[in-house]
UniProtKB/Swiss-Prot annotation:
InterPro entries (UniProt xref): AA-permease/SLC12A_dom, Amino_acid_permease_CS, APC_YAT
Chain ranges passing through the membrane: 58-78, 82-102, 127-147, 169-189, 194-214, 242-262, 281-301, 325-345, 376-396, 403-423, 447-467, 481-501
UniProt-recorded Gene Ontology molecular function terms: amino acid transmembrane transporter activity
Its biological purpose: General amino acid permease with broad substrate specificity.
GO biological process: amino acid transmembrane transport; amino acid transport; transmembrane transport
Name this polypeptide is given: General amino acid permease AGP3
Keyword RNA-binding appears in the UniProt entry: no
A Gene Ontology cellular-component term: endoplasmic reticulum
Ranges per topology, Extracellular: 79-81, 148-168, 215-241, 302-324, 397-402, 468-480
Main location class: membrane
Amino acid sequence: MAVLNLKRETVDIEETAKKDIKPYFASNVEAVDIDEDPDVSRYDPQTGVKRALKNRHISLLALGGVIGPGCLVGAGNALNKGGPLALLLGFSIIGIIAFSVMESIGEMITLYPSGGGFTTLARRFHSDALPAVCGYAYVVVFFAVLANEYNTLSSILQFWGPQVPLYGYILIFWFAFEIFQLVGVGLFGETEYWLAWLKIVGLVAYYIFSIVYISGDIRNRPAFGFHYWNSPGALSHGFKGIAIVFVFCSTFYSGTESVALAATESKNPGKAVPLAVRQTLWRILVVYIGIAVFYGATVPFDDPNLSASTKVLKSPIAIAISRAGWAGGAHLVNAFILITCISAINGSLYIGSRTLTHLAHEGLAPKILAWTDRRGVPIPAITVFNALGLISLMNVSVGAANAYSYIVNLSGVGVFIVWGVISYTHLRIRKAWVAQGRSIEELPYEALFYPWTPVLSLAANIFLALIQGWSYFVPFDAGNFVDAYILLPVGILLYIGICVFKSNHFRTVDLRSINLDEGRRKDMEADLSDQESSLASSETMKDYKSATFFRYLSNIFT
């Protein structure tokens, strides 16, 4: 029998035993102490978080986690501002960028699953300053999402129980989510798994309804197909509307990259991460493109309900059901949005708290945020990040509501910053890999279309970060202009500050001196026969990187 090491070589167990080295995976040999061996330890040795997420958790977290209130409610605002064509273009183009980013994540995180994801890798392969900019931009993105979802959740419950004030619902659920997150990552993964299935089923049900509705099979209504693309039209505000929709779409795609963070707490990142990455195109087509097509087909962009004050009523799903003649459908949609809100808050707390934990381990945040209890739960980081969500209470006051809306809208440019850093870091890792004489064949996962995917993503994210506030130029809107661009100068100042006061230089790391084996590990539950067969199967990277794009498409569903 043979066992697998990091270089995918085989060694004889008997020979290994003579050398007094414990094999990782062998059914007839005593198991290694999982707390002593860093490769298969139950806890990440660099951050202390527990490795409890299963393959199915990671897979459904990536697939169902992107179906949030933004897609169900916020996309209606995007439809109103841009029209169905703008929505389709926005989801398609941002989807191409998201696909490129996920290919980069697949290569980076499968190679280096330990230690904290892309912020840690940005420090190792660039400097101390880059992860600060990327990490805090990521915190801002999910802080904005968290505050918005607390407010959305409370608004939904007020739809049914208006006698309870908005702040009452916010405080009740603040404590509930705090307690839930402190239980542990295993419960988080299991809960998100089942919530993801509910969201997928709900979205597919809406697609089926849409097909029946536009085909004229509801209450003998005539078929109208894509009539709303002609009247009132495909675009509501021309190119300006398209520019606005791009910012919306970038926010809706945020969280796609969270697989990189979850890998640190995954039992088997070598299997889970590639599986999640291969599902990216599936997510883009079924979730985002599907939403763009069916929203544009069932709801005209000038429907007055898209600007309704009640979040439930301005959901395109609720509007379509109401237009079909089912007035009580708003309650069903309300329940569906409630499920997505619970999942979105849960996911935002997880992503934001782990990002703070990793920043603290890099010396870029207070050390207390790096502390985890004996169960691997980063209690201080969870509590601090959850406390940031209380800014949603500002929306209770009429005077503070405008300030609240500006804060929530910060998330758009933050996504472009994070994605740009991920793509740049991928280029640096590959450059270091080649500079030290490593073979591309050694990579456990090779990004499709490299180097075009990271280069395209980097260029596109820089471009979109610079033009995403274009709609506020004429007529000039000072408040929204500052809101659109404030993170860019703040990020530059943060970068300079870290270089001056922490690093004492502006140099980047020497790629030839980096330890390329640091941060690599084996899967905890890898089975020898599975590992050997996977190396010979069509899912391995030897076949994957030599396959055509159509071969790649066929592997997405396996």
